[in-house]
A protein has these predicted regions:
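Extracellular and organelle-lumenal recognition/adhesion modules and their flexible linkers in secreted
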Residues: 117-444
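Extracellular repetitive beta-rich solenoid segments
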Residues: 2-6, 12-128, 153-155, 302-303
Length: 444
């Protein structure tokens, strides 16, 4: 008895069929195969089979539409893309250059275009570890002698210390250059005063406290800055030495010596009278807990009127190469707050200005408390003052001394001494002359 094939149900004889029945079954099989393959018959040269319906073996011969297919020749190089200039109109978009990104562009023929990837804002807060790196903050005054000859002395621009055995002046100057500088308004001028003959090294630098240094341990860093020289700069071969120094101690001053000192970057820059940017890289040791950056040169002969160098846009970042300059913070207010952590000055007004109200007098002066707007690095270690007086309801009394008593990083208690006051009167601290101030230091 005939059976059928599993896929097309074609009848086939079985092993039990009689000979005559087998022949009949074979004939039926042939007819079934012929009927199933009828759609494969015919066609002309170049035609291809196309499904007519979803039914099995239901085909139709059709002419190939190669002309409307996307041809291989439309692309010419690795990375080419196929786009369109209109409906049903494919077109080639040539590969871009390394680093470019594909963007929508309605002005382009294909509506697409290659463009340089945005690097984002160049002003990235926190990237640069150097505080007051464009020399905007000068609480101590924008010009002054800086003959500090020991650690912790000779500060002028906030956070920047100076050292020279002779007499030098550090001052804020307008850069006056928007061609070679990225619109930085100010720089520091470090000047060997005219007539000086001391050949000792002149230093200008900044120490990082340990809290801000540890993040650099084991990292590759890029150190960059802008600098130029004065017409009488006496450094040999117009060279300005520079260093990024690391240590393993805690909150030390580099002039006193870092414990475990190393110099991941130590080289020199050749200055001209035009602003240039200098960039250097190095690797901070993995056990580093403190950092400093500084510039130095040895004066030669007798200093002329313009024996100085100027520097600005100083940047230390964790990077394999220097990026565009960015200050530590994004606003002057934030940069000032960062500097107040180390030095807090009150007063400095022209004429009479009140510094502190609501004190209570005794016959020898008063005890006064100052609250800091920003927590200092540590409790202040020194107090500075000038042209102060204590005034009560009837008189003013010149201040003879100000001493720290009980201090914390948030508050300074001071004893303000004078003579001749009447006890238990309300009094206030103000000026006896132009330039009155009181300042608290927690510098390294």
């Amino acid at each position: 008895m005939a059976t059928v094939t599993p896929n097309f149900n074609w009848p086939v004889p079985t092993s039990t069929d009689l000979v005559k029945d087998g022949a009949t079954a074979i004939e039926a099989l042939g007819d079934s195969i012929d009927a199933s393959l009828v759609d494969l018959k015919g066609g002309t040269t170049g035609q291809v089979l196309s499904k007519t319906t979803n039914a099995d073996m239901d085909f139709t011969w059709v002419t190939s539409d190669d002309a409307n297919a996307i041809q291989n020749t439309i692309v010419d190089a690795k990375g080419d893309l196929i786009a369109a200039t209109a409906a049903d109109t494919p077109a080639r978009l040539a590969v871009g250059t390394n680093g470019q990104v594909l963007t929508a562009d309605s002005t382009a023929a294909t509506g697409l275009a290659w463009a340089t990837a945005s690097s984002g804002s160049t002003n990235v807060a926190g990237k640069n570890g150097v505080l007051n790196s464009q020399f905007n903050v000068w609480q101590r005054g924008t010009s002054g002698s800086a003959s500090g000859t020991s650690a912790g002395t000779g500060y002028n621009a906030d956070r920047w210390w100076n050292y020279y055995a002779g007499t030098m002046t550090v001052s804020r100057q307008a850069t006056g250059d928007t061609t070679n500088l990225p619109f930085i308004q100010y720089c520091a001028r470090i000047q060997r005063n005219s007539g000086q003959t001391s050949a000792t090294s002149i230093y200008h630098g900044q120490d990082f406290e340990t809290l801000n240094s540890i993040a650099y341990a084991g990292k590759t860093v890029a150190f960059s800055f802008y600098a130029r020289k004065g017409a009488n700069f006496s450094g040999a071969s117009s060279a300005l030495a520079l260093s990024v120094q690391s240590g393993t101690g805690t909150d030390q001053h580099v002039l006193s010596g870092f414990t475990g000192s190393t110099n991941p970057i130590s080289t020199s820059a050749t200055l001209t009278t035009t602003w240039q940017r200098f960039t250097y890289t190095g690797t901070i040791p993995t056990d580093s807990t403190q950092l400093a950056v500084y510039f130095t040169y040895d004066g030669v002969g007798t200093a002329g009127a313009n024996d100085y160098f100027e520097v600005t846009g100083v940047q230390l970042e964790i990077a394999g190469s220097a990026s565009a300059y960015s200050p530590n913070t994004s606003t002057y207010q934030a940069e000032l707050a960062a500097c107040l952590r180390y030095y807090d000055k009150r007063g400095g007004q022209t004429g009479t200005g009140t510094i502190l109200n609501n004190a209570l007098s005794n016959s020898a002066g008063t005890n006064a408390a100052f609250n800091f707007p920003v927590n200092m690095r540590v409790a202040p270690t020194s107090v500075e003052y000038a042209s102060l007086r204590l005034s009560d309801t009837s008189s003013g009394f010149t201040v003879s001394s100000v001493t720290l008593t009980n201090c914390t990083p948030t508050t300074a208690n001071v004893n303000v001494a004078t003579t001749g006051m009447t006890a238990f009167r309300s009094c206030y601290l103000d000026s006896s002359a132009t330039g009155n101030y009181i300042a608290f230091s927690a510098e390294l």
